[in-house]
Design a protein with these regions (language model features):
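C-terminal hydrophobic helical "lid"/dimerization subdomain
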Residues: 1-3, 257, 269-273, 315-371
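Glycine-rich beta-strand-centered segment in the early N-terminal region that forms part
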Residues: 25-39, 53-109, 152-154
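Cysteine-cluster motifs in flexible loop/terminal segments that predominantly coordinate metals
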Residues: 42, 84-88, 97-149, 153, ...
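N-terminal Rossmann-like NAD(P) cofactor-binding module of classical short-chain dehydrogenase/reductase
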Residues: 95, 259, 282
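Mid-domain Rossmann-like dinucleotide-binding core that forms the NAD(H)/NADP(H) cofactor-binding site
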Residues: 138, 152-236, 244
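Glycine-rich phosphate-binding loop and adjacent beta-alpha segment
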Residues: 206, 223, 228, 233, ...
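Conserved amphipathic alpha-helix within the SDR
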Residues: 240-251
Length: 371
């Protein structure tokens, strides 16, 4: 076992990541050291990188990133199985959570770990034990209390890497929003989350599934993931016309569920207008604190509409996500979610290429770092 790991350390917006050597910690009896095999650049990572989700960073920087998969490098002495009780050994491929519900607050005691207000900590520097706090490194330390699950052999790392963030997040979000057989679903944003949400909604027998974006390549990919209709913002620049189209495509009713997977709050009011009376708006994309929207409350009252906010998920969703990938691997082109791969040393290039904000188009759906 090496004494150090390589990690990309972030020092703030506008500053390059620096590759540093970081101590590998002693593994707690209930902890697991994981050799990262793929770490994706998530949309929330771009928010932090660009600075529109400001954080107070430690002086020694921050190892961030969370959407990842890997192999067991070392098991704590008390860990013999994964979280479902299946035998686990060093070298096994695993999918795992990246947040740690406290287990003591009201939400946790009410069996709602995804709602735990303490599950995500402020950024910790690489000098703070256990040092390996994020995905953008060649090792990750799963602390005691984290959940991990063995990965089916037929799923490659590039397909598994989104499981613990994008796929689990959208599966849990659609579950919380109450999507039912035959529901009409609007998906705003055809990035990594939106594409996977399209496939999940179709698997839940939603019909029609309508995907809204402004990048033609992503909308074409949305069709490959089952979208019944796609709506290009540039082709239909008027908001009222877009809402009218959604009404037409849903038999004059509107969407049962509309979802924000974009991350810019300007889309929210439009999404709510696309809902039917009694519909539900699922807000996942906008994580930036301080963002504001103009919303007429009577839209909710007279329309009996609901807004549901979701961040992270209950860990039981991960094994279901893995099973879902196995079951649908011949149906949907999962290998196309990761469109670009970079070595860890080229993380600055990967982030610059992944940035789509204020660009007319982009060829990247999701970039993966391969340490």
């Amino acid at each position: 076992m090496p004494a150090t790991a390589r990690a990309a350390v972030f020092f703030g917006p506008g500053k390059p990541f620096e590759i540093r050597d970081v101590p590998i910690p002693e593994v707690d009896p209930n902890g697991v050291l994981i050799r990262v095999t793929a770490a994706n650049i998530c949309g929330s990572d771009l928010h932090f990188w660009r600075g529109d989700a400001p954080l107070r960073l430690p002086e020694d920087g921050w190892i961030f990133g969370h959407e990842m998969t890997g192999r067991v490098a070392k098991l704590g002495s008390r860990i013999k199985t994964d979280s479902l009780g299946r035998p686990l050994k060093e070298g096994d491929r695993v999918a795992y959570t990246y947040f740690y519900p406290c287990g003591r607050c009201y939400a946790c005691l009410n069996k709602e770990p995804a709602a735990c207000p303490h599950k995500l900590e402020r950024p910790l520097g690489p000098s703070t034990p256990p040092h390996l706090h994020g995905a953008f490194a060649d090792h990750y330390y799963l602390r005691p209390g984290g959940a991990l699950f063995a990965v089916p052999a037929e799923l490659p790392d590039e397909v598994v890497a989104p499981v613990n963030c994008a796929l689990a997040q959208v599966m849990y979000g659609l579950h919380v929003a109450g999507v039912r057989f035959g529901d009409r679903v609007v998906i705003q944003g055809a990035g990594g989350l939106g594409l996977q949400a399209t496939a999940v909604a179709k698997d839940m027998a939603a019909a029609p599934v309508i995907v809204v974006d402004q990048i033609p390549g992503r909308l074409e990919l949305a069709k490959a993931f089952g979208a019944d209709h796609t709506l290009n913002l540039k082709d239909v620049p008027d908001r009222r016309e877009r809402v009218k189209l959604v009404r037409e495509w849903t038999g004059g009713v509107g969407a049962d569920v509309a979802c924000d997977f974009v991350g810019f709050p300007a889309v929210i009011t439009e999404g709510i207008e696309m809902l039917r009376s009694g519909g539900t708006y699922l807000e996942i994309g906008t994580i930036s604190r301080g963002a504001k929207i103009e919303l007429e409350p009577s839209l909710l009252v007279w329309g009996s509409k609901k807004i549901v906010g979701v961040i992270q998920y209950d860990p039981w969703i991960i094994p279901r996500a893995l099973d879902f990938l196995v079951r649908t691997k011949a149906r949907w082109p999962w290998d196309r979610i990761i469109s670009h791969k970079y070595p860890l040393e080229k993380i600055n290039e990967a982030f610059a290429a992944s940035e789509w904000h204020k660009k007319e188009t982009t060829s990247i759906t999701r970039a993966a770092l391969i340490p």
